[in-house]
Amino acid sequence: MKTYINEIRENESVESLFLVKEKSSGITKTGSTYLRLKLVDRSGDIEGRVWTFAENVAASFEKDDFVRVTGKAVSFQEHLQLNITHIEKISEEEILFSDFFPMTERDIEEMFQSLLEVGRQIKNPHLSQLLQLFWEDESFIKLFKMAPASKWLHHNYLGGLLEHTLSLAQLVLKNACHYTGLDLDLLLTASILHDLGKVDELSYYRSFDYSDEGRLLGHIILGIERVEDKIRQLPDFPANLSTLLKHFLISHHGQYIWGSPKRPMTVEAVMLHFLDDMDAKINGIQQFLKRYIPEGSRWTAYHRMFDQHFYVPPLSEKVELPDKIEKDQLEEE
């Protein structure tokens, strides 16, 4: 039975399966070699130390291998670590990938069907045909369903890209109807395609990291390349529509300092940027709240990106709101 890292307590004996995220050697004060490991599963990470026969043990496995570990949890400088007495490499057939990599809590196929339903609301035949080419691309869809949306900022789990994309498309539907004169077809298409380059930018075979293409080009350029490749298969696709759609992709980060080659220059592009930013930040904060609230406290640990702590108020009584609020209810008495 798998013991997850977040279940390990001080002084407990541990025998479980882990993924080796980092591996290095050190020298003790007495001159002996020891092995330093970072072991991970879907619940977190823990440092492991091999104190005896470290050189022989180190030769038996490599970074990114799955291993079976026996040891004892001890506290060192207020952090748990494993003193390992036995470690051996195991094959992928002996593990469940869902034990090692964080995954969306939602059903992937249900989310994908919901995204297809959103896409069916697009009336523009050119944009509809463009999306259809992506839906028919089995290799792309396989990656799109499983990719994380980022390495650590938001939706950083398998299925995260699909979850974020669906959330953004649904936010577009809910907010666009509040305003007049918006091109909903273009907004919806852009919301579905805005981060598609992340299937190439991020590597997630053993851990979440950037691919060489991701580091050198980034998901915006990689996404533009995929869109242009599909548009070339549609000879009647209007050039001005192609330009506008690509503008959404290159501007959705909003500012040059955030990686956008251009700032949003249409009302729709501005809306996409702010909704995308909101969805990413809310998810990022929610993930942070799950992991970094000290026991007995209503304040989180310090969040470096937001440069602040977050307060978690007591749960208030749930209030059922009416589906529709009549106009006279909003008027001042």
Per-segment meaning from a language model:
Residues 18, 64, 168, 276:
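Divalent metal-coordination and catalytic microenvironments
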Residues 268-333:
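Acidic, carboxylate-rich catalytic segments that either coordinate divalent cations
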